[in-house]
Amino acid sequence: MRIVLIGQAAFGAKVLENLLERDEQVVAVYTPPDRGSRQDPLKEAAVAKGIPVLQPSTYKDDQVFTEYQELEPDLTILAFVTDIIPEQFFKLPSSGSICYHPSLLPLHRGSSAINWAVIKGRKKTGLTIFWPDGGIDTGPILLQKEIEVGPDDTTGSLYFNYLFPMGVDAILESVELIKEGKA
């Protein structure tokens, strides 16, 4: 299965690392453009493995979509994406596109999802892997994982102790479900 990974930061890098450990065929990685001298960890991981890296300033450019089409993806994985990506990108892959979001959608769509779970005093939160459509964090849900929010939890503890590692595992589980025809 030809996979395109769109993401950033340590989360995106960990997803890439785990996909490659499972011998998945990652044909390209998209990350945000470099800012300053520091490169994104996902970009660094992809370059180290010889995987092409694309860094468009916008996904609304026709040339960006043409380059994406030429990759002929079977599956696109969105692993920590903060850009607005046109729906045509999600519809192109033969097996679709999946996206990670650190909340139990439809709750807390958009940015700062973990913060809102804490601010609202939620007793539970979690993550969602879904099939994105044209909205902001909308589309059919593939799977969700739930966690309890303790009285001493912070956005950092929820993310680094639970939602980050569970999110990587949930993406891998989703890829397997798709490959097995169960999703």
Regions found by a protein language model. Name each.
Residues M1-A183:
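One-carbon transfer enzymes
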